[in-house]
């Protein structure tokens, strides 16, 4: 039994408008619109009653159970995205590490011999504060997380000095260096 799929999704009709089509679901809110594509022959039914969305399965096959939880989570994330939005914060730790935004490009200097230029995807806003704090925000949870991961991959945090691109609340478990074990 899918626990996530059985959750009802509560809607605020003043803020969110759902439109169900044969091949997609459109979620419209104050921050924008998200369209979720639906696979053909989806074994789910969507019922909207009294500002609550209930998703039910047509059968008990394994594939139906998988879709049940997945689409419940995707619709919930779309509703949160168009009403509140999503945000990820990154911080740059290291000597000379800095970032700035020029138009649609995020420029990073992470200790390489050349600057790194990351194109900012449509639908995202990137702000840089104090040259070392990057805030990525948008209505799509997937897109925000994916871009944050792309930026982070350029210089993953290392455990000896703690340098790199870190999520704002991330804690790096530090390792002792070679000299910490004792000299012979």
Swiss-Prot record:
Gene3D superfamilies: Ribosomal protein L6, alpha-beta domain (3.90.930.12). One of its GO terms (biological process) is cytoplasmic translation. One of its GO terms (molecular function) is structural constituent of ribosome. It comes from the Bacteria. It holds the Pfam family Ribosomal_L6. Keywords: Ribonucleoprotein, Ribosomal protein, RNA-binding, rRNA-binding. GO terms for cellular component: cytosolic large ribosomal subunit. Part of the 50S ribosomal subunit. This protein binds to the 23S rRNA, and is important in its secondary structure. It is located near the subunit interface in the base of the L7/L12 stalk, and near the tRNA binding site of the peptidyltransferase center. Belongs to the universal ribosomal protein uL6 family. This is Large ribosomal subunit protein uL6. The lineage of its organism: Bacteria, Bacillati, Mycoplasmatota, Mycoplasmoidales, Mycoplasmoidaceae. The gene is rplF.
């Amino acid at each position: 039994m899918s626990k996530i799929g059985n959750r009802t999704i509560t809607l605020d009709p003043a803020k969110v408008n759902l439109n169900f089509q044969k091949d997609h679901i459109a979620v419209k809110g104050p921050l924008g619109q998200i369209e979720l594509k639906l696979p053909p022959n989806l074994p789910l039914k969507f019922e909207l009653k009294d500002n609550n969305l209930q998703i039910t399965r047509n059968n008990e096959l394994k594939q139906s159970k998988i879709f049940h939880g997945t689409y419940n989570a995707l619709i919930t994330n779309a509703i949160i995205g168009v009403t509140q939005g999503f945000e990820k914060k990154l911080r740059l730790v290291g000597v000379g590490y800095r970032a700035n935004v020029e138009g649609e490009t995020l420029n990073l200097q992470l200790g390489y011999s050349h600057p790194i230029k990351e194109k900012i995807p449509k639908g995202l806003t990137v702000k840089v504060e104090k040259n070392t704090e990057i805030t990525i925000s948008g209505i799509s949870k997937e897109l925000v997380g994916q871009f944050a991961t792309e930026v982070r991959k350029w210089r993953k945090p290392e455990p000896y000095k703690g340098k790199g691109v870190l999520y704002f609340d991330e804690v790096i478990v530090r390792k002792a260096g070679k000299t910490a074990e004792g000299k012979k």
